[in-house]
Amino acid sequence: KDKKLLILSNGTVVLDQDKFNTLLKLDVVKFSLDSAISKTFYRIDRALKNINLEKMIEKMAEFKTQFKGDLVMEILVVKDLNDNEEEFIALNQALAKIAPLRVDLSTIDRPPAYAVKKISEERLLELSKLITSTPVLLPKRHYEGEKLNFNEEELLKMLHLRSQSEIDIENKLDKTSQLLLDKLIKE
């Protein structure tokens, strides 16, 4: 069993006991939770109007207690919707209950379905500091300084924590690490 099975879900699947039980069999589960405040949650995730947010958070926490794999949370930050201190204090409290391995925090980076705007990387970093209950991973699109030189173990750990785009690999890793990664992929 050298490959891991991952699913990305909006999190509502925990409300269905059959789906809840099925997810327990996976290696990595990634739930999105863009707000822990009902009014904002329904504005961002418009299709989920009939979902009880508090119950969903409780079921995510219950899922974590039974899950043997890695539970990761994903938060998409949208300008003027969930990009404020109140939102992140509420998210931090919800994340403390859920207790995931980590949180992947990002903003809009593709053309959105609705008229929404991204926030700056600087603001994303500021908001990430309000999440103290679990480790936070931030995407970094613009790299400065020296490129990283990773050995095989470090490369595998990095990829285990977060998949990397080709752009990320080109910008983050030195040539030696890129060649080693190519070799690992071919094996």
Where are these regions (language model features)?
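Short, basic/glycine-rich phosphate-binding loops at helix/coil junctions
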Residues: 36-40, 70-72
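Structural preference for beta-strand elements that scaffold enzyme active sites
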Residues: 4-6, 28-30, 70-74, 102, ...
